[in-house]
Amino acid sequence: SQATNKPKFKIPEGFANAVAKVSLVIAKELQKDCVLTTNREEFVVSGTGGLGTAETKFDTDHMTLSKVSVICSPEHLTKVLADVTHLIVDKNSVQMHGERLTYYVATRG
């Protein structure tokens, strides 16, 4: 399994709410409904539509995130990026190609 090779990040108190808030902002900017599902081990926030996807997943002890990729107008990209900058673990992971913004949301342990 490739899962064991993914980096793990400690989740600080309040981080789950921060990620949820940011993901909701992304979904709102994409003008798509946002779906939140929770269980004891995992918290998932996702906004999906024809314009792109924004998905965040992590468990209660460690965090492993998939790539977040969204397509929206330049002004919306600026707003989204401003909202998530403090949560992006690797600033070099942020890429913009036309109207597509790709980044990884995480926090340093």
Over which residues does each language-model region extend?
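DNA polymerase processivity clamps
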Residues: 2-109
